[in-house]
Protein backbone atom coordinates (compact mmCIF):
# COMPACT_ATOMS: atom_id res chain seq x y z
CA UNK A 1 0.00 0.00 0.00
CA UNK A 2 2.79 2.44 0.88
CA UNK A 3 4.56 1.72 -2.41
CA UNK A 4 1.33 2.38 -4.32
CA UNK A 5 0.75 5.66 -2.47
CA UNK A 6 4.32 6.75 -3.18
CA UNK A 7 3.84 5.97 -6.88
CA UNK A 8 0.65 8.04 -6.97
CA UNK A 9 2.37 10.99 -5.28
CA UNK A 10 5.28 10.84 -7.73
CA UNK A 11 2.85 10.66 -10.66
CA UNK A 12 0.84 13.63 -9.37
CA UNK A 13 4.01 15.67 -8.91
CA UNK A 14 5.20 14.84 -12.43
CA UNK A 15 1.86 15.82 -13.96
CA UNK A 16 1.85 19.11 -12.01
CA UNK A 17 5.39 19.90 -13.09
CA UNK A 18 4.61 19.16 -16.74
CA UNK A 19 1.58 21.44 -16.57
CA UNK A 20 3.62 24.23 -15.02
CA UNK A 21 6.30 23.86 -17.70
CA UNK A 22 3.69 24.10 -20.48
CA UNK A 23 2.23 27.17 -18.78
CA UNK A 24 5.67 28.80 -18.67
CA UNK A 25 6.27 27.98 -22.35
CA UNK A 26 2.92 29.54 -23.23
CA UNK A 27 3.87 32.61 -21.19
CA UNK A 28 7.19 32.89 -23.02
CA UNK A 29 5.49 32.64 -26.41
CA UNK A 30 2.89 35.25 -25.47
CA UNK A 31 5.58 37.55 -24.05
CA UNK A 32 7.61 37.23 -27.25
CA UNK A 33 4.57 37.99 -29.42
CA UNK A 34 2.95 40.76 -27.36
CA UNK A 35 5.49 42.29 -24.97
CA UNK A 36 9.07 41.89 -26.18
CA UNK A 37 8.80 44.59 -28.84
CA UNK A 38 8.65 47.23 -26.09
CA UNK A 39 10.02 45.47 -23.00
CA UNK A 40 12.85 43.68 -24.80
CA UNK A 41 13.29 39.92 -25.23
CA UNK A 42 14.88 39.56 -21.79
CA UNK A 43 12.93 42.26 -19.95
CA UNK A 44 15.43 45.02 -20.66
CA UNK A 45 14.08 47.57 -23.14
CA UNK A 46 16.34 49.26 -25.65
CA UNK A 47 17.73 52.61 -24.49
CA UNK A 48 15.52 54.46 -26.98
CA UNK A 49 12.35 52.65 -25.91
CA UNK A 50 13.16 53.08 -22.22
CA UNK A 51 13.63 56.82 -22.71
CA UNK A 52 10.67 57.38 -25.06
CA UNK A 53 8.15 55.32 -23.12
CA UNK A 54 9.61 55.38 -19.62
CA UNK A 55 9.93 51.59 -19.50
CA UNK A 56 12.01 50.25 -16.62
CA UNK A 57 13.97 46.99 -16.91
CA UNK A 58 12.89 43.95 -14.90
CA UNK A 59 16.01 44.43 -12.78
CA UNK A 60 14.58 47.71 -11.39
CA UNK A 61 13.51 47.22 -7.74
CA UNK A 62 10.05 48.68 -8.40
CA UNK A 63 9.48 46.13 -11.16
CA UNK A 64 10.91 43.23 -9.15
CA UNK A 65 8.45 44.09 -6.37
CA UNK A 66 5.39 43.66 -8.60
CA UNK A 67 3.19 40.66 -7.87
CA UNK A 68 1.75 38.39 -10.55
CA UNK A 69 -1.66 39.95 -9.81
CA UNK A 70 -0.29 43.46 -10.36
CA UNK A 71 1.31 42.44 -13.66
CA UNK A 72 -1.96 40.79 -14.74
CA UNK A 73 -3.85 44.01 -13.97
CA UNK A 74 -1.36 46.03 -16.02
CA UNK A 75 -1.63 43.64 -18.97
CA UNK A 76 -5.45 43.77 -18.84
CA UNK A 77 -5.93 47.48 -18.13
CA UNK A 78 -2.70 49.18 -19.17
CA UNK A 79 -0.74 51.67 -17.10
CA UNK A 80 0.86 54.99 -17.97
CA UNK A 81 1.78 54.93 -21.65
CA UNK A 82 1.19 51.18 -21.89
CA UNK A 83 -2.12 50.27 -23.49
CA UNK A 84 -4.04 47.15 -22.43
CA UNK A 85 -3.07 44.04 -24.37
CA UNK A 86 -6.24 42.98 -26.19
CA UNK A 87 -7.14 39.50 -27.32
CA UNK A 88 -5.58 37.50 -24.50
CA UNK A 89 -7.45 34.91 -22.48
CA UNK A 90 -7.23 35.01 -18.69
CA UNK A 91 -4.94 31.96 -18.88
CA UNK A 92 -2.61 33.76 -21.30
CA UNK A 93 -2.54 36.85 -19.08
CA UNK A 94 -1.60 34.73 -16.07
CA UNK A 95 0.99 32.79 -18.07
CA UNK A 96 2.67 35.94 -19.38
CA UNK A 97 2.63 37.55 -15.91
CA UNK A 98 4.22 34.47 -14.37
CA UNK A 99 6.79 34.34 -17.18
CA UNK A 100 7.59 38.05 -16.67
CA UNK A 101 8.39 37.30 -13.02
CA UNK A 102 11.04 34.78 -14.15
CA UNK A 103 12.97 37.37 -16.17
CA UNK A 104 16.08 38.70 -14.49
Positions of PLM-derived features:
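N-terminal export/targeting leaders of redox proteins
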Residues: 1-25, 104
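Short amphipathic alpha-helical segments at helix boundaries and their inter-helical linkers
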Residues: 4, 27, 84-87
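Short, solvent-exposed coil/turn segments
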Residues: 10, 17, 51-53, 75
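Extracytoplasmic/secreted proteins, especially bacterial periplasmic and envelope-associated proteins
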Residues: 26, 30, 66, 70, ...
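Periplasmic/extracellular electron-transfer cofactor-ligation site
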Residues: 28-55, 77-83, 102-104
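Electron-transfer interface patches adjacent to heme c in soluble/periplasmic c-type cytochromes
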Residues: 56-69, 84-91
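Short leucine-rich amphipathic alpha-helices used at interfaces
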Residues: 69-71, 76-77
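C-terminal capping alpha-helices of c-type cytochrome domains
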Residues: 74-75, 86-104
Amino acid sequence: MTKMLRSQIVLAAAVSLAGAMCFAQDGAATYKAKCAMCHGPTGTPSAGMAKAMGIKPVSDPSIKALTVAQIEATVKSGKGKMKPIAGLTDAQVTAVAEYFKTLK
